[in-house]
Design a protein with these regions (language model features):
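Well-ordered beta-strand positions in beta-sheet-rich domains
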Residues: 11, 28, 62-64, 147, ...
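Predominantly extracellular/luminal cell-surface or secreted proteins
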Residues: 2, 7, 44-46, 68-70, ...
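Long, domain-scale functional regions
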Residues: 7, 16-23, 31-33, 73-409
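C-terminal, structured domain-capping segment
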Residues: 23-74
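Surface-exposed interaction patch
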Residues: 1-14, 59
């Protein structure tokens, strides 16, 4: 419509058949009482040189346009909100108690927790996000023939998923093992991508792929390229290389001088999680990896879970988690889903080697480790906000599944 009615620049595939088939062109279009609107419907015939279309010559396109009362298919997000009616928050100062100082492993099925996300240079303000924490059992998704767990929503409304594997009861919920970066003999190697190590600015030039990014990208190419249309290209994966408070990056002038990045303090390395204060914010655009961000550009819409996301989900640094486990390390049988696995969050430079946060499955806590060792890799990706819900209730036996379409939405 050109006079205030429904309008869109996207196209719907119309089936080519001798039998009349209903195709919905638009949902939730409304016309106020007493108002006249004019609509133009455009049909485009695609010229596909790989398909013999000679049978279509001389054929006629016909049909009827009509308006009917109906209900739009729910999005996956709307179904998640419906299935989890309870809202809660976690804080580092909840009436004097730090909720993030102890593991959250209580049953939380039916509850979504809320927080905010702000990406400096990308979002104009903080956006509310929903996340799962504790021992929830209804955040399972089956997508692209793999099982995933929902981590949270993102600033763009997309839904972030953590890889589980080919079955919900697996204990090998990873795509294999890789170093984060090899070698690890410079602070630049905490980067998912990185530049030269002259300064904090130059390591953020992001000209070189990390070892683990290359590993994940190859897996994506082999398994998920046909599903890219369902994935958000604006969702951000934050590889936070901000200096910690009181820390100075001076590697060029003093290579053996130790310093820590901001996640070291948010996870509270020094007092083992007692003052942990995780955040979904990303304070430098050059750390905010996404397909759309030219300052920190991904080749494919996939990366890793951050240490902050692990802390929000119920994990704590250097404190052993007992069963029942929080959802992010648990399979459907209640066992740990994977051996120790990488996060995306830098820890620091110890004067000789770079370190990154990981989930230590042997001790069941957040820990730091040299970037050069081989650890398990659990990819993370984000389903578009417009993705339609198909079936499922989020349980491992009946996971959420999405509507498959030509456009993705």
């Amino acid at each position: 419509s050109t006079n205030g009615g429904y309008s869109t620049d996207s196209y719907v595939d119309v089936p080519k058949s001798g039998t009349a088939t209903d195709t919905i062109l638009a949902y939730s279009a409304s016309i106020d009482v007493g108002v006249t609107q004019t609509y133009t419907v455009e049909f485009i015939y695609k010229n596909d040189e790989d398909v013999d279309q000679s049978d279509d010559m001389g054929k006629t396109l016909s049909g009827k346009l009509f308006i009917t009362e109906g209900t739009e298919e729910p999005t996956l997000l709307s179904q998640i909100l419906k299935d989890n009616p309870t809202r809660s928050t976690r804080s580092n100062n909840n009436n004097g108690t730090n909720d993030f100082a102890t593991h959250l492993t209580t049953t939380t099925t039916g509850t979504l927790f809320t927080s905010t996300e702000n990406i400096t240079g990308i979002t104009d303000s903080s956006k509310e996000v929903y996340y799962y924490a504790g021992n929830t059992t209804n955040n399972w998704v089956k997508f692209a023939n793999f099982y995933w767990r929902i981590i949270r929503t993102n600033h763009d409304g997309s839904i972030r998923l953590l890889y589980v594997g080919t079955s919900h009861d697996t204990t090998e919920g990873n795509i294999g093992k890789s170093a984060f970066n090899s070698p690890g003999t410079s602070p630049k190697y905490v980067g998912y991508k990185y530049g030269e190590d002259t300064s904090l600015d130059t390591i953020r030039n992001n000209t070189t792929d990390s070892t683990i990014k290359t590993y994940i990208d190859i897996w994506y190419q082999n398994n998920l390229t046909n599903y890219t249309k369902y994935l958000s290209t604006s969702a951000v994966y934050c590889n936070d290389r901000s200096e910690g408070t009181g820390q100075t990056y001076n590697y060029a002038s003093s290579p053996k001088s130790k310093f820590n990045f901001a996640p070291y303090y948010r996870m509270d390395y020094d007092t083992e999680g007692a003052t942990a204060n995780p955040s979904y914010n990303c304070t430098d655009k050059r750390d905010a990896f996404s397909v759309d961000n030219t300052s920190a550009k991904l080749d494919y819409p996939v990366s890793l879970m951050t240490a902050d996301e692990i802390a929000f989900a119920g994990g704590v640094a250097f404190q052993t988690m007992s069963t029942p486990y929080a959802w992010f390390i648990s399979n459907s049988a209640g066992s740990q889903v994977s051996s120790s696995w990488w996060s995306l969050s830098p820890d620091g430079w110890n004067g000789a080697r770079s370190c990154v946060w990981r989930w230590d499955s042997d001790n069941a806590y957040l820990n730091i480790v040299d970037v050069g060792i081989d650890d398990a890799v659990r990819p993370v990706l984000s389903l578009k906000s417009c993705i339609k819900y198909s079936t499922g209730n989020g349980s491992p036996e009946t996971p959420y599944e999405i509507v498959k379409t030509e456009s993705g939405c």
